[in-house]
Each structure stands twice: as structure tokens, then as C-alpha cells.
Amino acid sequence: MEVNYERLRGSYNDYRKLELGLGEFGDDFVGLPDDPFCMNIRSTLNSISDWFHENQIGLVSEDHTLPEDPFCMRVRSTLNTISDWFHENQKEIGVVDQMLFETLSWFYNNDDDDGDDDDDGGGGGEAHDAFELVLPYLELKEILAVEVVCRSLRDSVGKEPFFWTSIDLNDSFLQYRVTDESLLKLTRRALGGVRCLNLGGCVGITDYGLKQVLASNPHLTKLSVSGCLRLSTAGLVSTLRDLKSSNRLGVKSLITGGALYFTKEQFKELNLLLGGDAKVGLQERKKRFYTSCRSEFYLEDDRVTDLEICPWCEKPSLVFDCPADTCPLKGQYPYSKSSCRACVVCIERCHECGSCLNDCENKPFCFAFSCVVCIEKRSNRL
């Protein structure tokens, strides 16, 4: 079925009827206020963003600390609940995941030179020779599971630095379990040869732990700290600065995922430390869409970080483009060529296609941000 886009770009009343599926009976609902509880969500998002930017200055000193929960969001309580859930449901996660829990507990309770000790992990049988051909193609989760099968596989995996040069902890339940100590023990297996480290969602990693890992792996060139909630912008910049001064900094590309808030001065220093340019020309930048950037672990072009200066608010942030060929925002502002390029605070985007949700004050009162085109497609599938 072909979608009539002209009809979808109709009035706000038609949009409310289409979303609610009320047809002619939707007139009674269209008259409802857009913000019945006076929450003023748009201004709240801007206030939160401004607060973070204003309070990032001068936080390098230990005397300056942020409040535990400035907006009463109870983030730490939520994280503790998630962690407790994993502890309580270990038996229901599966055999492979249980092996990973055992392997991770080995990181906590043993040193790297304890390989000769007796253990109950599979006995002393010899593994098939074919495993030597398979191991280089396994991912981290599979390698950790193979390691607890038998003693010979543990020796093969633990004593081969090649298997640990690229460590990806993103999209794994391990990200809620890894601490500074266990991460350091894990990276030591590469004998200082870690090249790529993805810590996406590792909520237990602190500034101190990250500094230890970076200092012990001077050849690490690619780092992702997306979702590392215990890291601070000031601590990260300070770590990179110290390693740079001692000529031990190997990081060339950094992915933040928008989890850290940088001031303009911090963003400029970050680019200098990583050897990049804070003012990358638009012609040198490929388009980035909101839907394809949520869990990516790569950097296109030659940029050193996923952050840019937003053309609207002129603050360092994740900047996205609009995938729509025709957008109502184009031509309405002095910088028409880049009017669809902005951070998610300045321009809210559809969570399904990434297009602009302009004129947010006239949107229905809901938290499921979707454009009318995606709503129409979703209704046709019902």
C-alpha cells in the first residue's frame, strides 16, 4: 500500500485522529490541552542540558563534586535493581551465561599466575585439535565460555594474548558485573596489547579503573565509554592529559555515546589530545542518522570522536541528520543547508526512522516519539 505523504502532512487535528484511531469521534479528544500537567518537557530538557554544561567547569578538583541525584531520577537505585535482578536470576539465564558468571568470579578471586592450580572446571582432558582453528574466530562471550570447559582449553585461551587484543563488553550482561579490578585482570591477558576496547554500558567502571587500563595498554587506539555512568568528563580528560604528557597515550578515537557532557573548552582539549580537529568541515562529514547510531562502535571519516558542535545550541553533543528528502524545518532558519542537523535536545527525532519532530509544543502529550509516517505504517501492519 502506497503511503500518501501529502495527507500525512495535514493539520494537527488529523494527526491526533490518526494516532488515536478515533476517526470522527476524535474531535472530543483533539480539544484536550497539549500539556495538561504543565510539565513543559522541552524547557526541562534544555534546563538539564544547560545545568550539566554549567557545572562541568572546574570539576577537576576533588573539592568540586556533583550532587548525587540533582533531578530526582533515582538512576543509581535503578542500576542497583538491575544488578540485584541478575544476581537472583543467574540460574534462569542459561548454561552458557552461568559459565560466564563462573569465569567472571574467577577474575575476582584469582591472580593471573594461578593457572597451575587445580580447579573443577572440566578436569584434565585434552581438547580436540580442531579447537585451535576455531578459537581465533570466537567472540569474547564464546571465549569465556570455552575457557571453563577443561584445563587444556583454559591454558590455550589464557596464555594466548591474541584472543584479548579486542575486547567488546557491549550488549552483554557482563557489562553490569565488570568492575575496575576484573577489567584490569581481563586486559592483562593481552600483555599490554589491547587495541580495541568497548566498555558500552559498563556501569561499574570508574575514572580510576579506566586510567589503570589505559596506562597498562599504550597501544590501545580505539575506546568506547558509551553508557559508563560512573565516568566523569573531567576525570576522562584528566586521564588522557596525564597519559599524553607521559607519552603513554595511544587512543586515537573515542566514542562517548552522548553519556558525557563536555564544555567547549573540554571538547577542544579532547580533540587536541586525540590528535584531531574540533572544527571538522561539513563536506568531510558523512551523514549520521539517529536510528543507526545507538549502538555503533565505529567512526566514519577521520574524526576522533563522535561528538560535534551542534549548529543550533553550539554545544558539544551527538549531532544527527534528517533522513527525509523534504523537511518542514528546511528554509526556516538562516543556516538552511544545515537546519536539520542538530542534537536531540534541539530537535527531537522519531525513534523509528530518525526524522525531525518539529514544532514539539504542538505534539500530542506522550513519550513515544514517532512521526506520522511511522504511525501510519504501524497502523497498516495491525
From Swiss-Prot:
Q: Where is the F-box domain?
A: 16-105
InterPro entries referenced in this protein's UniProt entry, alphabetically:
F-box-like_dom_sf, F-box_LRR-repeat, LRR_dom_sf
Tell me which domain of life the UniProt entry assigns to the organism this sequence originates from.
Eukaryota
What SUPFAM superfamilies would the database entry show?
Answer: F-box domain (SSF81383), RNI-like (SSF52047)
Instruction: Supply the PANTHER family for this chain.
Output: F-BOX DOMAIN-CONTAINING PROTEIN, MITOCHONDRIAL ATP SYNTHASE COUPLING FACTOR B
**What is the protein name stated in its UniProt record?**
F-box protein At3g27290
Which species is listed as the source?
Arabidopsis thaliana (Mouse-ear cress)
